[in-house]
Amino acid sequence: MRKISTFDLYPGMVLGEDVLNFDRQVILSRGTELTDSFISRIELNGVLEVYIEEAAEEVPPPPEGCNADYAPRHPTYADRIKNSPDFKKFKEEYNQITSGFKFKINEMVDKNVEIDTKELLKEPLQLITASGSSSNTLDMLHNMRDYDDLTFAHSMNVALLNYVAAGWLNWSEADKELAMACGLLHDIGKLQISHDVLTKPGKLDNTEYKHIQQHPVFGYKLLKDRVNVHIMNSALMHHERYDGTGYPLQIKGEAIDRFARLTAISDVYDAMTAARCYRGPLCPFRVIEIFEDEGFDKYDVQFILSFLSNVGNTYVRNGCVLSDGREGEIIMLNPGKLSRPVVQCGYEYVDLSKFPDLRIETLK
């Protein structure tokens, strides 16, 4: 049995220890065989690493880009995006900007260099402008998953998502840019976590576990009196949950800074949509379904419904393939079940909310 990053999990692995959330509640039991849904649940609860039985590690993952349940039978929407000139240009600029961001952040932490948020925002804002629209930004991020340093790429993704999501909420341009800055710096505290703790091969003791839980506090202290208060609060509160089940303060509702409430959604969404060794990025409607299954009580309802409905609306009039192999076009969302829209297959209209065993497999 050994510890493995959540990012490296794939279906078929068997848990060697119970998986706990930050309230120390069991979310999956030892001996559970992982499925795509279970992996998403682990990610949704912000768990960074789990223990896997040694025997399970020898099971080879399915081919890259293949879902464990459904092997793609058609060229996907993601394939078209990745092969487009716009994506190739975005990818090149994204990698350059993220590398520059990494250098600047390390200087801020290691050399106590002044934090100039306006300077930090210049290039990410250019990237947003170059993508052309919120839907294009989502498409690019869903497929932009091979940057070497995941910590910094994740922060860049959350920044871009925050900007788009703030626009959906009709926030002012100044607040949209502030939300972007909150995303860029929300995880800066991870740079203060002991390397020995992060790489420890054995089980973490309670002291070490609490040390990891303190990364929001470390981030807050790094940023205190150096940046806007909302940026400080987003570093401190992005793991807080609306129902009070988060950490480190276990505050709830409106006591959580509104920028942190938005950052929490972008943070989890980016983690769930990341490609894995056994599959490409999750279909957006699958991600929406995971949020629905886990419940909305952990997030600001206005923010999460705006976020998910706008993600869904991005793909209305898009082609798709259903899990039974039929091809169709997404016609409209179901407000009460955003993950299950109405799909037109030929002359037939299929309301997925009425067919629990049927889902959108891929976009095309």
Where do the protein language model's features map onto the residues?
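Terminal helices and disordered tails flanking the catalytic cores of nucleotide-processing hydrolases
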Residues: 1-111, 115, 281-364
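Short clusters of hydrophobic/aromatic residues that line enzyme substrate/ligand-binding pockets
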Residues: 19, 198, 204, 242-247, ...
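Acidic/His-rich, divalent-metal-binding segments that scaffold phosphate/diphosphate chemistry
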Residues: 68-210, 224-225
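Alpha-helical scaffolding flanking metal-ion-dependent phosphate/phosphodiester catalytic sites
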Residues: 158, 178-193, 209-305, 313-315, ...
